[in-house]
C-alpha cells in the first residue's frame, strides 16, 4: 500500500505554484493561501519521515501547553529551546497558547479552562458541534510574544472515534508544520484515551502556507527523499489528561531520513 504523503505534496505544491510574498520577518516567502491535509490516525502516527523531527521537543511542548505555562524555563529544564528566540530575559512569553487553553480570562475576572471543558463535552455530548478550543484571544494578542499561528481546533466524534481539525493561520511549512501535525495528533490520542474513544483523523487546515526563501534548498533536498512508513504511537494510561509525563509517550519504529537544519525566521 503506498504511503500517504500530504505534507510532502503540499511542499511540492507551494514550490511549484506559490506566490512570491514579503513577510513580517523580512525573509521573503513562497506562499499559497488555503490548503487542507488529512491523516488517518489508525494508519500510523503522522511524524514526518523525509527528515528527522525532534520528537522530544514536540512532546514537551504539548505537555507545557497542557500545564497552562507561558514561561520557557520549564522547557529549558527539560532541554527544549524551541521558544527561546521569542522569550523575554526572564523567560516570559505573555499569555500564549497554554494560558489561553487553560485560563482564558472572562470580563468578570474568572478564567475558563478550555481543555477541561472540551474533554467534559466529549464525555457528555460527543455529537456537539461546539467543541472548539481557541488560542486567538484578540484582546490579549498585543501582550503575546508571538500571536498564535495554530489558532484554534475542533473535535468531532463519529462511530466512537475522535477526530480533530486544526486551523493554522500562518504555516512555516519546513520548520513548524511537522511539529504541529505531530503535536495535535498526539493531543487527539490523549483526548480520545481520556474520553474512552478510539481515534479517527487529524485534519490540518492552513491559511498562509509558506516556504521561506532561505528554506528552499532544504525543502528541495527533503523532497528528493523517499518517504518511509509512519511510526506507531504507544501511549501509557493515565487517570487524568494532566497527569501525562514525557515517558508516557513512546514512538515506535520511527526510521526517518537525517535531519535537515534551517534558520528560524523570528
UniProtKB/Swiss-Prot annotation:
InterPro entries: Thymidate_synth/dCMP_Mease, Thymidate_synth/dCMP_Mease_dom, Thymidate_synth/dCMP_Mease_sf, Thymidylate_synthase, Thymidylate_synthase_AS. This is Thymidylate synthase. PANTHER family: THYMIDYLATE SYNTHASE, THYMIDYLATE SYNTHASE 1. The lineage of its organism: Bacteria, Bacillati, Actinomycetota, Actinomycetes, Mycobacteriales. It is an enzyme of class 2 (transferase). The keyword Membrane does not apply. GO terms for molecular function: thymidylate synthase activity. DUMP binds at residues 24, 129-130, 169-172, 180, 210-212. Keywords: Cytoplasm, Methyltransferase, Nucleotide biosynthesis, Transferase. NCBIfam families: PRK01827.1-3 (NF002497), PRK01827.1-5 (NF002499), thym_sym (TIGR03284). CDD domains: TS_Pyrimidine_HMase. It is found in: Cytoplasm. Signal peptide: none annotated. SUPFAM superfamilies: Thymidylate synthase/dCMP hydroxymethylase. Disulfide bonds: none annotated. GO terms for biological process: dTMP biosynthetic process; dTTP biosynthetic process; methylation. Homodimer. It catalyses: dUMP + (6R)-5,10-methylene-5,6,7,8-tetrahydrofolate = 7,8-dihydrofolate + dTMP. It comes from Mycolicibacterium vanbaalenii (strain DSM 7251 / JCM 13017 / BCRC 16820 / KCTC 9966 / NRRL B-24157 / PYR-1) (Mycobacterium vanbaalenii). (6R)-5,10-methylene-5,6,7,8-tetrahydrofolate binds at residues 54, 172, 265. Belongs to the thymidylate synthase family. Bacterial-type ThyA subfamily. Pathway: Pyrimidine metabolism; dTTP biosynthesis. GO terms for cellular component: cytosol. Its EC number is 2.1.1.45. HAMAP family: Thymidy_synth_bact. Catalyzes the reductive methylation of 2'-deoxyuridine-5'-monophosphate (dUMP) to 2'-deoxythymidine-5'-monophosphate (dTMP) while utilizing 5,10-methylenetetrahydrofolate (mTHF) as the methyl donor and reductant in the reaction, yielding dihydrofolate (DHF) as a by-product. This enzymatic reaction provides an intracellular de novo source of dTMP, an essential precursor for DNA biosynthesis. The active site is at residue 149.
Amino acid at each position: 500500500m503506498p504511503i500517504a504523503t500530504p505534507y510532502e505534496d503540499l511542499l511540492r505544491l507551494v514550490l511549484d505554484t506559490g506566490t512570491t510574498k514579503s513577510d513580517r520577518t523580512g525573509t521573503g516567502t513562497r506562499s499559497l493561501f488555503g490548503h487542507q491535509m488529512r491523516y488517518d490516525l489508525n494508519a500510523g502516527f503522522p511524524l514526518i519521515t523525509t527528515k528527522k523531527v525532534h520528537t522530544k521537543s514536540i512532546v514537551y511542548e504539548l505537555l507545557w501547553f497542557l500545564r497552562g505555562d507561558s514561561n520557557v524555563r520549564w522547557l529549558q529544564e527539560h532541554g527544549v529551546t524551541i521558544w527561546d528566540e521569542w522569550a523575554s530575559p526572564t523567560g516570559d512569553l505573555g499569555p500564549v497558547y497554554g494560558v489561553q487553553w487553560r485560563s482564558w480570562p472572562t470580563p468578570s475576572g474568572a478564567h475558563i479552562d478550555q481543555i477541561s471543558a472540551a474533554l467534559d463535552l466529549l464525555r457528555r455530548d460527543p455529537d456537539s458541534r461546539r467543541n472548539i478550543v481557541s488560542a486567538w484571544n484578540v484582546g490579549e494578542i498585543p501582550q503575546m510574544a508571538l500571536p498564535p499561528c495554530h489558532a484554534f481546533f475542533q473535535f468531532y466524534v463519529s462511530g466512537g472515534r475522535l477526530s480533530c481539525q486544526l486551523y493554522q493561520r500562518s504555516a512555516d511549512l519546513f520548520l513548524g508544520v511537522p511539529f504541529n501535525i505531530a503535536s495535535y495528533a498526539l493531543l487527539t490520542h490523549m483526548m480520545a484515551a481520556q474520553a474512552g474513544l478510539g481515534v479517527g483523523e487529524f485534519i490540518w487546515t492552513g491559511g498562509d502556507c509558506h516556504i521561506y526563501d532561505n528554506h528552499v534548498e532544504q525543502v528541495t533536498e527533503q523532497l528528493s527523499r523517499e518517504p518511509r512508513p509512519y511510526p506507531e504511537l504507544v501511549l501509557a494510561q493515565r487517570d487524568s489528561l494532566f497527569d501525562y509525563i514525557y515517558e508516557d509517550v513512546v514512538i515506535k519504529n520511527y526510521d526517518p531520513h537525517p535531519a535537515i537544519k534551517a534558520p528560524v525566521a523570528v
